[in-house]
């Protein structure tokens, strides 16, 4: 596995040697704008693998994306290879309908230490919940970013990531009540601890998430990619584009219903993805917002 191939995949041409916050931010932003957050393997009859070699082949060589356990594993490898001080962490995703965090550790994120300051880096949440900059681990501090304001709080050695969102304007009236729209202005995202993890700690959950009928990943096919101004999402046959802050404190959210035969071209032109097997788009009833 060649780090230069990773840099080429994300379009990164700047310093490889400066292990500072600016470099870390640039790596994160290049990755989230080049590598989609997606689960299409499941809906093509293929598995979501955790081995680094398989992930590298899928994302770097075949120019696909992946879900958090894959894209953040790749990010962890790349940052470590560059020389950053990294720690793999595990998170518990907030289930909005149930109003509680997941009992299983289903999210992978990365801690990076720079000059005795700790940061959370996460390229694997996608949609409008995706951070665009590393978050310094300071409890109660607000982090205004392009997508929203992110907030980390710590209580009894557990950290919580929340988001304060803008209003949203949906010009297509057919979608103003879409179940894909986030209804809460204050959104809990996930919790985590600073206990170091290894990729093996996620193996059972990796299997569960792609096989259980209760999993959002089996319920919906999705693909999400950040842009310099917003984020594209494809959920089932519904294509959306959210432009952040198109007006003061308002996001513009555009919806379009696709015919199934249009999806292949949309995946290529918007997300840069060419699938080897036939995708069966799915939009089940599990909670998932864009």
Swiss-Prot record:
- What's in the GO CC field? cytoplasm
Sites where the protein binds substrate = 106-107
InterPro entries linked: Arylamine_N-AcTrfase, Arylamine_NAT_domain_sf, Papain-like_cys_pep_sf
Q: Read off the SUPFAM superfamilies from this record.
A: Cysteine proteinases
Which protein family is it in?
A: Belongs to the arylamine N-acetyltransferase family.
Give the main EC class.
transferase
What PANTHER family is this protein classified in? ARYLAMINE N-ACETYLTRANSFERASE 1 (PTHR11786:SF8), N-HYDROXYARYLAMINE O-ACETYLTRANSFERASE (PTHR11786)
Identify the domain of life: Eukaryota
Q: What is this protein called?
A: Arylamine N-acetyltransferase 2
Q: Name one Pfam family in it.
A: Acetyltransf_2
Listed binding positions for CoA are 103-104, 208
What is the species listed in this Swiss-Prot or TrEMBL entry?
Answer: Mesocricetus auratus (Golden hamster)
Q: What does it catalyze?
A: an arylamine + acetyl-CoA = an N-acetylarylamine + CoA; an N-hydroxyarylamine + acetyl-CoA = an N-acetoxyarylamine + CoA
Quote the Gene3D superfamilies the UniProt record gives: 3.30.2140.20
Q: Where in the cell is it found?
A: Cytoplasm
- Which key words are in the record? Acyltransferase, Cytoplasm, Transferase
Q: Which EC number(s) are documented for this chain? A: 2.3.1.5, 2.3.1.118
Molecular function terms, GO-annotated: arylamine N-acetyltransferase activity; N-hydroxyarylamine O-acetyltransferase activity
Q: What residues sit in the active site?
A: 68, 107, 122
